[in-house]
Regions:
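CheY-like receiver
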Residues: 45-46, 51-116
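Short helix-capping segments at alpha-helix termini
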Residues: 25-30, 78-80
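Short hydrophobic/Thr-rich beta-strand motif most characteristic of the beta2 strand and flanking loop
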Residues: 27-40, 47
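Cofactor-binding loop segments of dinucleotide-utilizing enzymes, especially the Rossmann-like FAD-
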Residues: 9, 40, 89
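Short, well-ordered amphipathic alpha-helices
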Residues: 15-25, 44-45, 72
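Switch/coupling loops of ABC transporter nucleotide-binding domains
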Residues: 2, 33, 82
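Conserved SAM-binding loop
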Residues: 6, 37, 86-87
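Conserved acidic segment of CheY-like receiver
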Residues: 2-22, 57
Length: 116
């Protein structure tokens, strides 16, 4: 089972990403992929206290309350094996993101092709 968590404060982006990942998961059911989306870093961290950290976390960088880079640090404290992928419209945080050994840094606007 591959657990993917998405955190983006933009409901439209969160919905598009979640729908695309779920469509991929349905088409590749042999991989056992589950996707869960969260509207804020705090909602994601609260859930992880109950369920544990995901295998992959797709994080918006610029969110109110807590930056995605800060959220990544918290996730990596919980599980150093979680792959982090940042999604952002800004390249200002690229150095910080890669210092966290991010698996990828995808620039918004999000398109399905950017995940391939």
């Amino acid at each position: 089972m591959l657990r993917i968590a998405i955190c983006d404060d933009d409901a439209g982006e969160r919905t598009r990403i979640t729908e695309d990942l779920r469509a991929y998961a349905d088409a590749h059911s042999e991989h056992g992929i589950t996707c869960t989306a969260y509207p804020s870093a705090f909602a994601m961290l609260d859930a992880f206290e109950k369920t544990g950290c995901p295998d992959v976390a797709l994080l918006d960088v610029c969110m109110p309350g807590m930056l995605g880079t800060e959220l990544a640090r918290e996730i990596l404290r919980c599980s150093a094996s979680t792959d982090i992928i940042f999604l952002t419209a800004s390249s200002d945080y690229a150095v910080d993101a890669f210092s966290l050994h991010a698996a990828d840094y995808i620039q918004k606007p999000y398109t399905r092709e950017k995940f391939s």
